[in-house]
Curated annotation (Swiss-Prot):
Catalytic activity entry: RX + glutathione = an S-substituted glutathione + a halide anion + H(+)
PANTHER family, alphabetized: GLUTATHIONE S-TRANSFERASE, GLUTATHIONE S-TRANSFERASE MU 7
PROSITE patterns (UniProt xref): GST_CTER, GST_NTER
Species of the source: Rattus norvegicus
Binding site for substrate: Y116
Major location (coarse): cytoplasm
Chain residues that bind glutathione: Y7, W8, W46, L47, N48, E49, K50, N59, L60, Q72, S73
Protein name per UniProt: Glutathione S-transferase Mu 7
UniProt-annotated location(s): Cytoplasm
Length: 218
């Protein structure tokens, strides 16, 4: 029986999950919910089902795999990572995965808060000012490794790809000074399963955010 991934019909927090499901050749189907237009941004498609799915903490995204019902995007990614041995093999690798997972989510939320803020245009220069320093830390952490934990890909590389590429969409030149990060993105997109997925009708790179966002809602 295929897994079910539920989320809005946007990229959002599901991008890394979709990529990981495709990479692991998982059998899954998507339940994509549509939000209404301004000014109401009607969410009834989701709210009508929210408390009927047996989720402990009802939210989007969710993954249902048989008796396992999981919310929180990183919990879903970790679950899939454990299923496919993509959580790091040594203690050092697992530490790197844990650190980066949380660091990436911090940075993801900073960008999301900016893009939903009514003062977006006023606050954008401040974000762009600190962006090179953020990218430099990722570049130094990756070093000469092919993947962020080491020689083998882990689930955190899927989050890293999403966050780095999302920032590249926001500011096209943000990785120009960091060739190892650009190489990482090319390496990730060059993976056969990922490349095939990106050419398919299932691939959903945009919109980045919901219709409520000031930037990234198209």
């Amino acid at each position: 029986m295929p897994m079910t991934l539920g989320y809005w019909d946007i990229r959002g927090l599901a991008h890394a999950i979709r990529l990981l499901l495709e990479y692991t050749d998982s059998s899954y189907e998507e339940k994509r919910y549509t939000m209404g237009d301004a000014p109401d941004f009607d969410r009834s498609q989701w709210l009508n089902e929210k408390f009927k799915l047996g989720l402990d903490f009802p939210n989007l995204p969710y993954l249902i795999d048989g008796s396992h019902k999981i919310t929180q995007s990183n919990a879903i990614l970790r679950y899939l990572g454990r299923k496919h041995n993509l959580c790091g093999e040594t203690e050092e690798e697992r530490i790197r995965v844990d650190i980066l997972e949380n660091q990436l989510m911090d940075n993801r939320m900073v960008l999301a808060r900016l893009c939903y803020n009514p003062d977006f245009e006023k606050l954008k220069p401040g974000y762009l000012e600190q962006l090179p320093g953020m990218m430099r830390l990722y570049s130094e952490f990756l070093g000469k490794r092919p993947w962020f934990a080491g020689d083998k890909i882990t689930f955190v590389d899927f989050i890293a790809y999403d966050v780095l590429e999302r920032n590249q969409v926001f500011e096209a030149t943000c990785l120009d000074a960091f060739p190892n990060l650009k190489d990482f993105i090319a390496r990730f997109e060059g993976l056969k399963k990922i490349s095939d997925y990106m050419k398919s009708s299932r691939f959903l790179p945009r919109p980045l955010f919901t219709k409520m966002a000031i930037w990234g809602s198209k």
